[in-house]
Each structure stands twice: as C-alpha cells, then as structure tokens.
Amino acid sequence: MPSRKFADGEVVRGRWPGSSLYYEVEILSHDSTSQLYTVKYKDGTELELKENDIKPLTSFRQRKGGSTSSSPSRRRGSRSRSRSRSPGRPPKSARRSASASHQADIKEARREVEVKLTPLILKPFGNSISRYNGEPEHIERNDAPHKNTQEKFSLSQESSYIATQYSLRPRREEVKLKEIDSKEEKYVAKELAVRTFEVTPIRAKDLEFGGVPGVFLIMFGLPVFLFLLLLMCKQKDPSLLNFPPPLPALYELWETRVFGVYLLWFLIQVLFYLLPIGKVVEGTPLIDGRRLKYRLNGFYAFILTSAVIGTSLFQGVEFHYVYSHFLQFALAATVFCVVLSVYLYMRSLKAPRNDLSPASSGNAVYDFFIGRELNPRIGTFDLKYFCELRPGLIGWVVINLVMLLAEMKIQDRAVPSLAMILVNSFQLLYVVDALWNEEALLTTMDIIHDGFGFMLAFGDLVWVPFIYSFQAFYLVSHPNEVSWPMASLIIVLKLCGYVIFRGANSQKNAFRKNPSDPKLAHLKTIHTSTGKNLLVSGWWGFVRHPNYLGDLIMALAWSLPCGFNHILPYFYIIYFTMLLVHREARDEYHCKKKYGVAWEKYCQRVPYRIFPYIY
C-alpha cells in the first residue's frame, strides 16, 4: 500500500471540485483504503480529495513574481494606457512591444475566463453525481468523492497558480469582471482547446452486494428462493426435514390468463396514479439543480382500490382464484419484472448523464441490477416512484384479504381466525401508514440514490406482495389458535413498535421541513459542513436508526400469531433483520462521506446503531 504524502494538520492547497482552482486547506485525516484525504477549507467546508489534487504551499510560493502581484484593476489600467500612449514616446526597457502587449491581453483574458469559472459554494445533496451545471469539458475536475472513471483535462500550472489568488468566497474588494470582446474570447477558447490532456486513472467504484458476481447470484437466486418458500408453505408438513418440496412442471406454473389479470391490476393502479387528485410536491435537488414534481395520491389510490374490491365481492367475483393460482401469479409478476427491467436498462442507454444514478458503475450486469437511470419517466409518469408504493404495497393488502377469505372457505369457518385477523390488521395499518405519509418516501435511499433496475423492480412488484403476505398464506394451510391473553401481548408489542417507528419518522420529517419549529426547540443537534444539522436527542439520540428498530418490532408482532410449530412464518423477521442491518451499513457509509467529522461526533454521542446496548 503506498505511503501517504501529507500529514494530519498540515496546511496545503487543495483543488476545489469542478474547477482548476486551488485553495488553502488543512489535512484532517487520510483513508488508507480509498487513498483519499479529508480536508477542511477556510469556510469550514470538508471534502475528500485525491493526493494528486493536493499540492504543498511551497510549490505556489516559488512561482510568485511581480507580474502576478498587481491588482486586476491596475492591470486593466496599464492595458488601457498602452493603447493610448503616443507612438513617438521612447519605450523603456520594461515596457512591452505591441506583440507582447497582445500576448498579455490574451493572458489577461484567459485569467478573466478562469475567474468566471470560480465555483459557487453549493450544498451537497444525496443524488449528486460528478459535475456542476454547465461545467465546460476542458476544465479539470476533482471528482474523487464520487469515484467516477472519466477523462480529466489539465490546464497549465501557471493558470492554476493565478487562480489561487481568488478566495473561496467573493469579497467586496474583489475586482468586477469585465467583458472580453468576441475576438479575444475565440482566441482564448481556441488556445485552451489545443492543450493536451491526460487520462488520470481513478480507483474503481466500490460495488455493493458483492459486486458483479453477487448481483448475478441475487438475480437468479431470489426468484428460485421465492418459489421454494411458497412450495414449502403449501406442504402439509413444512418443516425443514421435508426440504426440498416437490417441484411442479414449468408449464403448470404459466397461465396466460393469470398474466392478463396481473397486467390488468397494474394498469388499474397506473390509472389511479394519473388521476389529478392529491397535492403536488417537489423532490430533492438533482445534479443539475432541478426538482422533480410528484403527485401524492397513494392513499386515494388505496381508497379507490378498496371500492373496486368491495364492489367485486358484492358482485360475486371469486377471489379464491388468486389463492388457487398463487404460484402462477408469482411467476407472472416475476416475468413482468424482468421485462420491465430490460426496458429500463435499454432506455437508460440514451439517458443524459445528469439523469443517471450515482450508484451506477458502468458494468452492464451490475447496472441492470442496481438501476442505471435515477428517475425514469414517461412524460410526468415516474416509473420508480409509482412502483414503490402502488402495485406491490396495495397488492400486499389485497393478497392478505384473499388469504383471509381462503382460510374461511378451506377451514369451513364462519369468521376468520383471531391469528388471521391480527396479521391482516397489523399489516393493513402498516400499509395505510406508508400511503398516508407518502411524502417521506422522497427522501429515502431508494429515491435519491438507487437507480430503477431489477433490484427495486423485483422488490416492489414481486418480493413485497408475495413474501410480506407470507404469514397470511401460511395460516390458510396451518391454522393456529391464539388465546386472548397472548393476543393482547402481541397487540401491545405491535403498538410499541409502531409508536417508535412513527414517532422517529415524524420527528425526522418535521425537523427537515422546519428546523426552527418551536415544538422542536428541545432537541439537540450537531451542525455539519453541509449547512444541515443532525439530531442527537429525542428518538434519534436513542439509537441511530430508531425507525428500523420500530420496523423490526412490528415485523416480530405479525409473525407471532402463526405460533411456534415451524420456522417458516419467521422467515420474514429473519430476512428483514438482515435487510435493515445491510441498509444501515449503506446509510452509515453515505452519511460518513457526506457529513465527515460531524457524523463521527454523532456516532460518539449515539453509539448504538439499531438495537440499544446490542448493536
């Protein structure tokens, strides 16, 4: 491993991302794995820079000269006087010839062009990729924090040094920029264009989920695992001793009629999404500064879906068909997901760079899985946002209702079992809460960081409706009688989880909307270099992810009504724990990168991640 060049606390000059300008910075730390330095600018901004974007102060001081020390206004004055000077006056040795004067004018013009490119101090945001809006292709950029492999163009050291005379923030005494006539602009642009460039090798982006081999196994393994779980659950004895279950022929799993019903369901939800009801809000800023608009009508879609389902039941529609063809519906959803993922990847190949996800890598297999385009839209129809809460989440509730009716029919019950009522009620509350607080989805990692590919498509359209309804599906074939005292304890556990989950999310969302709200004045915070504050009290001073803790408690509560005869009903809580621990690790990585020292202070104040005194 190469040794570091600069020590902690050393004062050097670092390149500002998106420009060729160097400013005085202090070395805070060095990551030996990524070979990146965390530096602090004079205004408090903390960034990660590569070693070749940092230079010692001595390399600049050696280039000092009289010509660079004069003020811009005086340079402009001397330039003006050189044109009006009498031709008969004998020039002094220090005076310039006409040719030298012209070259100096060009140099001055180039300097002024560089000043115009002085970067603004922008607040970073989660879905930033690598470029500022309107940045020229020929200016060298420092994109180390984003780790994107790209060609980088290099200006001369002289231009870089001149740029260091301008501070990070504009001051009153700084000279106003003056216009450059079109002839000089063309000359400068031409001269800059012919400069040679060098390709700087950048360390490959860290890939999640085990990289390309990992996502390849996930894409093929998850559908297989899903069908094995459903087949195991349908067995009379679903114990692990009877694994693997008997496998049906492939032709038995495919029915065109089932696929048609699934398409009809999807299109109905599209229709509800497009209805002009519900308020319109803006999402988080994109790389180019745009804020996409989203219509919040998920709860209205749920009400309309309930009306359609109720009317269908009243008209005598047989919903037992869904239960008897449950595996076929799972296969239809999987096929639809694969087709959608192929479409998403193909359209992303033509998407502008600013529309790509920061999680994309350039590898076709990995990008097909993680999603290459951040917010794929057809007009105003946002595919990712729609799939996150509509077909799968509302479909989960419909499947639970189907299982409740199937239990009554198969077990010849006049009313559903208490266990089935608990499972349906708990999960109905969870879905309604998500739809009612739909706006909170816009700040999640799924929306602001991950692209829309196979991972989210399969998770939203297949995994959620067919795995999250697993407890209800299990109770149809494996009834479990729950006593009222036991039911009371389970209800209390569920309510505790919901209070933690909703309280933490509501506190976070309220603080994001209005940090100066008097109702939140009692909360303690840590200020960050991005201008935002981190909550270190309330729910977020208890553990770093109290919403995850509440989520897991609720997941346990809706598994307990299934009893303890088999481990299958507890697959969800096991899987969900692994999912949230992994997601917490992803959150930790991105927050540490974004907030730097402030995040480390927060971790010291709040040492436990999800489970207090455990993890």
From Swiss-Prot:
Alphabetized PANTHER family for the sequence: DELTA(14)-STEROL REDUCTASE, DELTA(14)-STEROL REDUCTASE LBR
Tissue occurrence: Expressed in the bone marrow, liver, heart, adrenal gland, lung, placenta and uterus. Expressed in osteoclasts and osteoblast-like cells.
Catalytic activity as recorded in UniProt: 5alpha-cholest-8,14-dien-3beta-ol + NADPH + H(+) = 5alpha-cholest-8-en-3beta-ol + NADP(+); 4,4-dimethyl-5alpha-cholesta-8,24-dien-3beta-ol + NADP(+) = 4,4-dimethyl-5alpha-cholesta-8,14,24-trien-3beta-ol + NADPH + H(+); 4,4-dimethyl-8,14-cholestadien-3beta-ol + NADPH + H(+) = 4,4-dimethyl-5alpha-cholest-8-en-3beta-ol + NADP(+)
UniProt record, GO biological process: cholesterol biosynthetic process; neutrophil differentiation; random inactivation of X chromosome
PTM annotation (Phosphoserine): residues: S59, S67, S71, S86, S97, S99, S128
Tudor domain boundaries: 1-62
Gene3D superfamilies: 1.20.120.1630, 2.30.30.140
UniProt subcellular location: Nucleus inner membrane; Endoplasmic reticulum membrane; Cytoplasm; Nucleus
Family annotation (InterPro entries): ERG24_DHCR-like (IPR001171), Lamin-B_rcpt_of_tudor (IPR019023), Sterol_reductase_CS (IPR018083), Tudor (IPR002999)
Pathway noted in the entry: Steroid biosynthesis; cholesterol biosynthesis
Organism: Homo sapiens (Human)
Protein name: Delta(14)-sterol reductase LBR
Superkingdom assignment: Eukaryota
Annotated TM spans: 212-232, 258-278, 299-319, 326-346, 386-406, 447-467, 481-501, 561-581
Membrane disposition: Multi-pass membrane protein
